[in-house]
Amino acid sequence: MTLFHFGNCFALAYFPYFITYKCSGLSEYNAFWRCVQAGATYLCVQLCKMLFLATFFPTWEGAAGAYDFIGEFMKATVDLADLLGLHLVMSRNAGKGEYKIMVAAMGWATAELVMSRCLPLWVGARGIEFDWKYIQMSIDSNISLVHYMAVAALVWMWTRYDLPTHYRLPVTVLLGLSMYKAFLMDCFVHMFIMGSWTALLLKAVITGVLSLSCLTLFVSLVHGN
C-alpha cells in the first residue's frame, strides 16, 4: 500500500512534466540538454539567493506566531534573481520565442521539482501512515510548472526590444505579481488562517488567472506582429 501511494504521488508530480515535454515539441528539437542547462542555472541562482539571504536577512526572532511582513517582503524581492536567471537561459538559446520559453520553463520547473520535492516524496510518501500533504505536494508541483511557463513568457515579452508601449505596463504588473505571489499567499494564509487545501486552491486560482492573462498578452503580441 505504501509503495502504491508513493507511485501515485510520483506519477501525479512527474508525469505532467513528461507529457508537457513530449507534447510541446521540445523532444523534436533535441532540447533535453538545453533543459538540463536551464536546470543547472536554476541551481546556481538558488545558491546565490541562499547566500544573499543568509548574509543580509538572518532569521527573524519575534513573538511566537508573529509574521514579519516587511522582512518577508524584502526576502520575496530577492526572487528577482529568478527572473534574471530565466532571461539568461532564454538569451543563450537560439530559436523562436515559444521554444525559448518552453526550454527555460521546463528546465527551471523540473530542477525545482527534483530539488524540493523528490526527497520528501521518496521518504514521506513511502511511510506507513497515509498523509494528504504528499498529494498536495504533487499537485503543487503542477501549479509550479504552469507558473514558470507564465513567468518565462512574461520575461521574454518584457525583454523584447520591439515590445509596444501599451504592453509594457501590463507585462510589468504581471511580472511584479508573479514575483511576489508567494509573499501574497503567505499573507493571506496568515491573516485568514487558511487550511492547506484552501491555500492550495487559492494558489491554483491565482496562478491560473496570472497564466491566462499572460497567455492573452502573448497571443495578441505574437499575432499582432
UniProtKB/Swiss-Prot annotation:
Residues 59-68, 127-131, 190-196 are lumenal. Keywords: Cell membrane, Endoplasmic reticulum, Membrane, Transmembrane, Transmembrane helix. The keyword Endoplasmic reticulum applies. GO terms for molecular function: ribosome binding. One of its GO terms (cellular component) is plasma membrane. Residues 22-34, 91-100, 158-166, 219-225 are cytoplasmic. It is found in: Endoplasmic reticulum membrane; Cell membrane. InterPro entries: TMEM147. GO terms for biological process: multi-pass transmembrane protein insertion into ER membrane; protein localization to nuclear inner membrane. The chain crosses the membrane at residues 1-21, 35-58, 69-90, 101-126, 132-157, 167-189, 197-218. It is a multi-pass membrane protein. It holds the Pfam family DUF2053. PANTHER family: BOS COMPLEX SUBUNIT TMEM147 (PTHR12869:SF0), SMALL SEVEN TRANSMEMBRANE DOMAIN-CONTAINING PROTEIN (PTHR12869). Component of the multi-pass translocon (MPT) complex. Component of the multi-pass translocon (MPT) complex that mediates insertion of multi-pass membrane proteins into the lipid bilayer of membranes. The MPT complex takes over after the SEC61 complex: following membrane insertion of the first few transmembrane segments of proteins by the SEC61 complex, the MPT complex occludes the lateral gate of the SEC61 complex to promote insertion of subsequent transmembrane regions. Belongs to the TMEM147 family. This is BOS complex subunit TMEM147. It comes from Xenopus laevis.
